[in-house]
Every structure is written in structure tokens, then in C-alpha cells.
């Protein structure tokens, strides 16, 4: 007996070992497949922001930068750091994708935590990685279905929506097109209606529907059916769907099941859609049914897809995933859902715009316009109420669906606490106020200037109660922030004084170029005025383009730059646009000297501004830190677009109205012809802002810009002192190579100096990216100032 038991134990051990080896082999093979897929099968990749999907009920909503990769099988996302060994954070199998559409995550009723950007959504069902994809393709039924949790009849099959925020309109369009194309090639089933907004826990932000299962309020874009053959004389619907009579015993509602021609409904439908039914619905009967992925399609060819579930009633009947009780009975309100298949995109003008060039269209503030073509990032073709058509700057308008507080003069968006205080103190008016985004993400703050008991600015967090009402004092609650502001215009209600006026009209932002597709400017269009300064490249004068737009005109010295190369680059640089970058309008290249025409910044260079206002700035750590953050935002944009500045310093940043700081002259150093400027031995080279790899090998990168940014921070917190004092360049080079860094400025907090030291890490790979610096400094600002 003992021997038998021992032998059995030995055999069992062998079986376990064999099983373990097979499992290990499968795991290894899966890793190899993943590696192969990433190396050879990547269709598109890039960095974007991902919104948490909150599959678990009580997990918090957050947004994180991720590296996304689209292959022919999956849409995956990874940690953004450690490029060579990124850790995968999640993936969506494209067999499970049901829709890819633009989304609205911010604005009225949206997520106040949402970062700026261009969101889109990917609606999908969860599909397992290996065997289930085979089942999907071959229609093998059984068990729990196709990797989606098999459910007993009457229970829900989980469906999810991934929200991703792209960096530009163009990038979003490219991602949507790419994902749809791969899904089309794979014959994945589609959803026909969807919600463009978010479910807030109480209602949809888009249509205000009060049920999470409310029918989708917008028609999804049409996807071509890759397996349709127009030559056979039948319609796509005939090829791709099998209708089920509303009078049959199978269903009480009208719907179609979209399916793959190689699969059969079999026991899936005949047996009440059991475990082998379509999408793996059910769990008991119908084991031999098809597992071909299907999407519910009402006979109006409209369906929706969101995080709401696909349902089965107690009889095994399929119900519409997004409608309580299934497809609506004719005559009910839901049955009259409007078909928005021809969706009209409306925008509202935030600023006035005067059309000067032919083909452009003037904008009237607060007027609505219909978008005809938004394929270009910075100039859209629109139609006004009178039917006039032309191009307008896209940053002057906001989609009506996204329009929130931007329509109000008192809303200043991302303005910091320090800039708000500076702005409100300028007018010195009692009751002057602004509403801004709080440093605490997702909240808003009211900043109010009062003279009681003396002139100062008070800040009040706008809070929400359990009923989602807004208040400054719990005794006075309102449904919306505008209602709250209106109330406190007439009643102080616990504030230091009544709200009376906002400071002034918002400054009109610059456009990407002076007109649609215009980058070459004729010198006769410019009226040159006073000299603003001079530098390495020549004299800078103030100018006016066609007598209406203030500009700065850089008159380049002949022989100082590679002109032909720069002119080509200028075509691209006019399309770079960010609130913290000085806008390049265009060039005058048809005569010599060349003119470079840029946005005019009334307070001039940051270096001179710091030195002029040292007495008022040196003790205002919050305002100095805000300047650093603004520069980091502009540099984050350049970093994302693979632009290297090469000469980042306080002298190459400019200051405009409302203490706005912008980065100037980005990329210009690349076109300098002076050899001394690009060698470590010359006096003109910005050695005191250069890292070791630039001093030793002239090796520029985004990380060399990070080093220079650390020096710029030091300049800001010393109010324009020269780095390394009177040390000669050779002495500076020696110190940098030995790892000796600049000392902490007296007015600088330790937390801020710690960020500077990170920028001065000896190896470029050890320095943080600008987007990381931006987040770190924002956190420091919140800790030190709010």
C-alpha cells in the first residue's frame, strides 16, 4: 500500500510538473508573441492621457499620462517612463471594440478634474487574449462564452468605455481613423448609437438623461463592412444581419443580430441564447451556439454603446443594452429618439475676429457658427447665420457642447492665485472678482478684491453639497456657478463684499499665422515703429500688420543665419501654438534682411522684467514660482512636438499682460552660422546654461533644455542675477564637469531648489521630462501657496 501510494504520489508529481512546464511554456510563448507584436505589428503609437475606467465601483477617478500602442490585434497602454522596458498597464483586444468616437469629458456637467486636450472614447467588451479570440473567429461555443463574463439570463454582460485625451485635434482624428481602420479590417461588430458625454452618477452630461441605460443620444459614425461584397447584388444589411421576427417565440422586441457569415446562431438563439450564445450571453443552455461577436441593432439601424450592460430578460430574450426594458414600444418618448447621423458641429465665438485676408470669415463674440471643415488644427472653415463661409482661427471658438464657464467674462480658467491677485490689485476696485480653476484639481476658486479692512484679495473655494448644488456659504446654494455669481452680485451672503465687476475683457490670443495658410508676409503690410531691443540676430522693432495687429519684427543681420533652411522651418513653426509660446506669425523672406514677425509682448524680456521689478518680486515666491510653471508648460508643448529650444534662458522669454510668461526664439539657435556660437570655446555660446553633454559633445536634446530650465529657474528666483557670477567661461565649464551646481537663491524654498537640482543631474537620462517638472512644480505651488 505504501509503495502504491508512493508511486501514485510520484505520478501525480510528474503530472503537476508537466502541467507546470506546459503553463510556463504557454506563458513564455505569450510573452514572445507580445514582444513580436510590439516589434513588428505596431500601427500607431504615442503619448496621451488616459482616464481611469473605474471598473470597480468605488475606485477614484484620475488621469494619467500613458504610452499607447495600436497593433493589428490590440490597443495597449504602458508607463511613459523607461522607454526600453515599458510596463504594460492594460490592453483592449480589438475584436471587442464596438465604437470609436470623439468624446466630451469636460464642460457643463462633465468631469471638473479633466485636463485640457482632445478626448475620444473607445467602447468595448472584454475579450481574453488567447483561446477566446480563436473562439470569436471560429464560432466555438460553450461555457462562459467569448471571454466576456458568462452570465445567467437576466444578468448583465459588462461593457466598458476607455476615455483617452489626445494632445491636438489632428492627433485625435488620426487615432480615431487608425483604430477604426484596424477594426474594419477585422470585421468587428459595431454599435450604432452612443453618448458623447460622461455619466456623472446622476445623469449623462450630453443629453441630461437620468438613467445610465438611456438610449444613446448621438448616431455613431458609419463603418464600412470589410466582408461585404457589393458585386453580389445584396445590400450590406442583407449580408451582415439576420432578422428575427418580432412575432417569433424568440423575442418580443424588434432587433437584428449582426454576425459573421461563417458562424451560425444555432443553440445560441434557439436555446434562448445560452452559454454558447452570441457574445457569450447566458450561462446554462445552448452550449453549441455561435460565439461570433454580435451587436444589437434595432431595425432603425441605430444602437448605442456605453458602460451600461447588455441584458437578457428571464426568457432569454435579448434587450437593448442602453434602454430600460429593451427596445422602446412605438409611440413612447424613447421611440422618437432623433437620428443625428448627420451631426452638425456648432461652435461659439469666445473672441471677435476681423477677417482681412480673402477666404477668412469675421467672428462676432458669442455668436454661433457651423463647422464645415475642421481637418486643419488651427484654421477651421465655418458658416455663419447668414450663410457666409470662410476660415476662422480655431482657438477663438469653443464647441457649443463643451462650452462651460468660458462664455463669462469673469472666468479666467487656469490663471494662478498669484496672477489673479496681481490682476485684481491693478484696478484697486472694491468688489472686482474673477473665478478660476483652483490649484486643488476639480474645484473652482472665487478671487475677490476688497478694501475691508484694507486693500487685499480674498480667495473662496466654490464647494458642492450632497445635492450637487454650489455654494460659498452653506446658507446660500445654487444649481450652477453662474447662478451663484449672480446671487452674490446682489447679496454679499458671507463674503467680504458684493461681487461688482470683472477686471476687463480677456486678452485676445494670437492666431497661428495672420491668416489661413499665410506665412509669407509682404514688408509693405508692416508699419515699423519704435525699437524694442537688439541681440545676437539683429534689431527688434514694434510693428503693426495692416494697421490692426500688434507685432514684434525681428530684422535679421545678413550672414548671421542659414536663411533658406530657416524659411522652410518657419512654415512649420507658424503652426506651433500654445498659451506659453510666443506665436510666430510669419516671415518676410522675399527681400533682405529677412524679417521674422511674431506676437508682441508688451513687457519685453523676462530678464529685464525681473530686474526692473526686483523690489516687488523678490518676496513674492508664489508669483516667481508661477513664472517657472508657465515656462514649463510651454516647454512641455515643445517637448511633445519634438522641438528642442537650444537656448532657453530668461533673456529668451517674454512677459505680456496679466503676468503671462511665454517662451520665445525656440529652435532659432539651430540656424546660427557663427561657429563661435556652437563651440564651447567661444564667448557667445550660452555656456552658463549648458549641460556637460553640450559642453563636451555639442549634443542637444530635450534633456539639455531641462538643464537650461533649471538655470532659468535660478535666474527667476534671483530676479535676474547672472549665473555663476563673474566666473569666466572656462571656470564654469570646469565646475559643471566636476558636478558643482549653483547655490540655492535666498528667496527660494527648499522644495523649489530640489526641483532645480533634478534639472542639473549630470546624466541627461537622469533628468525629468518637462511634463514631470510641470506636475512637480504645480504640486509644490499647491503646498506652499494655497
From Swiss-Prot:
Record's compositionally biased regions (Gly residues): 264-290
SH3 domain boundaries: 342-402
Protein name: Tyrosine-protein kinase Btk
Reaction(s) catalysed (UniProt annotation): L-tyrosyl-[protein] + ATP = O-phospho-L-tyrosyl-[protein] + ADP + H(+)
KW Kinase (keyword) present: yes
Disruption phenotype: Flies exhibit shortened copulatory duration (due to incomplete fusion of the left and right halves of the apodeme that holds the penis during copulation) and reduced adult-stage life span.
GO molecular function annotation: ATP binding; non-membrane spanning protein tyrosine kinase activity; protein tyrosine kinase activity; zinc ion binding
Keywords assigned by UniProt, alphabetized: ATP-binding, Kinase, Metal-binding, Nucleotide-binding, Phosphoprotein, Proto-oncogene, SH2 domain, SH3 domain, Transferase, Tyrosine-protein kinase, Zinc, Zinc-finger
Known EC number: 2.7.10.2
GO BP annotation list: actin cytoskeleton organization; cellularization; courtship behavior; determination of adult lifespan; DNA endoreduplication; dorsal closure; female germline ring canal formation; head involution
Expressed in which tissues: Ring canals in the egg chambers and imaginal disks of third-instar larvae.
Domain Protein kinase: 526-779
GO cellular component: apical part of cell; cell periphery; cytoplasm; germline ring canal; plasma membrane
Cofactor field: Zn(2+)
Cofactor comment: Binds 1 zinc ion per subunit.
Residues annotated as domain PH: 41-184
Gene: Btk
Keyword Transferase in record: yes
Residues at the catalytic site: 647
Composition-biased stretches (Polar residues): 241-260, 291-301
Biased composition (Low complexity): 14-23, 226-240
Region Disordered, residue ranges: 1-23, 226-301
Domain SH2: 410-503
Family of the protein in this entry: Belongs to the protein kinase superfamily. Tyr protein kinase family. TEC subfamily.
Entry binding sites for Zn(2+): 195, 206-207, 217
InterPro entries: Kinase-like_dom_sf (IPR011009), Non-receptor_tyrosine_kinases (IPR050198), PH-like_dom_sf (IPR011993), PH_domain (IPR001849), Prot_kinase_dom (IPR000719), Protein_kinase_ATP_BS (IPR017441), Ser-Thr/Tyr_kinase_cat_dom (IPR001245), SH2 (IPR000980)
Amino acid at each position: 500500500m505504501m509503495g502504491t501510494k508512493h508511486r501514485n504520489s510520484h505520478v501525480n508529481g510528474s503530472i503537476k510538473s508537466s502541467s507546470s512546464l506546459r503553463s510556463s511554456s504557454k506563458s513564455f510563448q505569450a510573452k514572445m508573441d507580445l514582444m513580436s507584436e510590439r516589434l513588428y505589428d505596431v500601427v500607431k503609437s504615442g503619448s496621451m492621457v488616459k482616464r481611469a475606467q473605474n471598473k470597480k465601483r468605488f475606485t477614484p477617478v484620475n488621469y494619467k499620462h500613458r504610452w499607447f500602442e495600436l497593433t493589428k490585434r490590440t490597443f495597449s497602454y504602458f508607463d511613459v517612463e523607461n522607454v526600453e522596458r515599458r510596463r504594460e498597464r492594460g490592453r483592449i483586444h480589438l475584436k471587442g471594440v464596438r465604437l470609436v468616437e470623439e468624446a466630451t469629458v469636460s464642460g457643463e456637467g462633465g468631469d471638473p478634474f479633466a485636463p485640457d486636450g482632445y478626448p475620444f472614447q473607445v467602447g468595448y467588451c472584454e475579450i481574453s487574449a488567447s483561446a477566446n479570440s480563436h473562439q470569436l473567429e471560429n464560432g466555438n461555443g460553450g461555457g462562459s462564452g467569448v471571454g466576456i463574463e458568462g452570465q445567467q439570463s437576466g444578468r448583465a454582460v459588462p461593457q466598458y468605455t476607455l476615455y483617452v485625451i489626445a494632445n491636438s485635434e489632428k492627433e485625435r482624428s488620426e487615432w480615431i481613423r487608425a483604430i477604426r481602420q484596424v477594426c474594419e479590417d477585422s470585421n468587428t461588430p459595431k454599435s450604432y448609437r452612443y453618448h458623447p458625454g460622461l455619466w456623472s452618477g446622476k445623469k449623462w452630461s450630453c443629453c441630461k438623461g437620468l438613467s445610465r441605460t438611456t438610449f444613446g443620444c448621438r448616431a455613431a459614425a458609419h463603418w464600412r463592412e470589410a466582408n461585404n461584397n457589393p458585386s453580389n447584388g445584396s445590400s450590406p444589411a442583407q449580408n451582415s444581419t439576420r432578422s428575427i421576427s418580432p412575432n417569433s417565440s424568440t423575442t418580443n422586441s424588434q432587433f437584428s443580430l449582426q454576425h459573421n457569415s461563417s458562424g451560425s446562431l444555432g443553440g445560441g438563439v434557439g436555446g434562448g441564447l445560452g452559454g454558447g450564445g452570441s457574445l457569450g450571453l447566458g450561462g446554462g443552455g445552448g452550449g453549441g451556439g455561435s460565439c461570433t461577436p454580435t451587436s444589437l441593432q434595432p431595425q432603425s439601424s441605430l444602437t448605442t454603446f456605453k458602460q451600461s450592460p447588455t441584458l437578457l430578460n428571464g426568457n432569454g430574450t435579448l434587450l437593448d443594452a442602453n434602454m430600460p426594458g429593451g427596445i422602446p414600444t412605438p409611440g413612447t418618448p424613447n421611440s422618437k429618439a432623433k437620428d443625428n447621423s448627420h451631426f452638425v458641429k456648432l461652435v461659439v465665438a469666445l473672441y471677435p475676429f476681423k477677417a482681412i485676408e480673402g477666404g477668412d470669415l469675421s467672428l462676432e463674440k458669442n455668436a454661433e457658427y457651423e463647422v464645415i471643415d475642421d481637418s486643419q488644427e488651427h484654421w477651421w472653415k465655418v458658416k455663419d447665420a447668414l450663410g457666409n463661409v470662410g476660415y476662422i482661427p480655431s482657438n477663438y471658438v469653443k464647441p457649443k457642447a463643451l462650452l462651460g464657464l468660458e462664455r463669462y467674462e469673469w472666468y479666467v480658467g487656469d490663471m494662478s492665485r498669484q496672477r489673479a491677485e496681481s490682476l485684481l490689485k491693478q484696478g484697486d476696485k472694491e468688489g472686482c472678482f474673477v473665478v478660476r480653476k483652483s490649484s486643488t484639481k476639480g474645484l473652482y476658486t472665487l478671487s475677490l478684491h476688497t478694501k475691508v479692512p484694507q486693500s487685499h484679495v480674498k480667495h473662496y473655494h466654490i464647494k458642492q453639497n450632497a445635492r450637487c448644488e454650489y455654494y460659498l456659504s452653506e446658507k446660500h446654494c445654487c444649481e450652477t456657478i453662474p447662478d451663484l455669481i449672480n446671487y452674490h452680485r446682489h447679496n454679499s451672503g458671507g463674503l467680504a463684499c458684493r461681487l461688482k465687476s470683472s477686471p476687463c475683457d480677456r486678452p485676445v490670443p494670437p492666431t497661428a499665422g495672420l491668416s489661413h495658410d499665410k506665412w509669407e508676409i509682404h514688408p509693405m503690410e508692416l508699419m515699423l515703429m519704435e525699437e524694442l531691443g537688439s541681440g545676437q540676430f539683429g534689431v527688434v522693432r514694434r510693428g503693426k500688420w495692416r494697421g490692426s495687429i500688434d507685432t514684434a519684427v525681428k530684422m535679421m543681420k545678413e550672414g548671421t543665419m542659414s536663411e533658406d533652411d530657416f524659411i522652410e522651418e518657419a512654415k512649420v513653426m507658424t503652426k506651433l501654438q500654445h498659451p506659453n509660446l510666443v506665436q510666430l506669425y510669419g516671415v518676410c523672406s522675399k527681400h533682405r534682411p529677412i524679417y521674422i514677425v511674431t506676437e508682441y509682448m508688451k513687457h519685453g524680456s523676462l530678464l529685464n522684467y525681473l530686474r526692473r521689478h526686483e523690489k516687488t518680486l523678490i518676496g513674492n515666491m508664489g508669483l516667481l514660482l508661477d513664472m517657472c510653471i508657465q515656462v514649463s508648460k510651454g516647454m512641455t508643448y515643445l517637448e511633445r512636438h519634438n522641438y528642442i529650444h537650444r537656448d532657453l534662458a530668461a533673456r529668451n522669454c517674454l512677459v505680456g499682460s496679466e503676468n503671462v510668461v511665454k517662451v520665445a526664439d525656440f529652435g532659432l539657435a539651430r540656424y546660427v552660422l557663427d561657429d563661435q556660437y556652437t563651440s564651447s570655446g567661444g564667448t557667445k555660446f550660452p555656456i552658463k546654461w549648458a549641460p556637460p553633454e553640450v559642453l563636451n559633445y555639442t549634443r542637444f536634446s530635450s534633456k539639455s533644455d531641462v538643464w537650461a530650465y533649471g538655470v532659468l529657474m535660478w535666474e527667476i528666483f534671483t530676479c535676474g542675477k547672472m549665473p555663476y557670477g563673474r566666473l569666466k567661461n572656462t571656470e564654469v565649464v570646469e565646475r559643471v564637469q566636476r558636478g558643482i551646481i549653483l547655490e540655492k537663491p535666498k528667496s527660494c524654498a527648499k522644495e523649489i531648489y530640489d526641483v532645480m537640482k533634478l534639472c542639473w543631474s549630470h546624466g541627461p537620462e537622469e533628468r525629468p521630462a518637462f511634463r514631470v517638472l510641470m506636475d512637480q512644480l504645480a504640486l509644490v505651488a499647491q503646498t506652499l501657496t494655497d
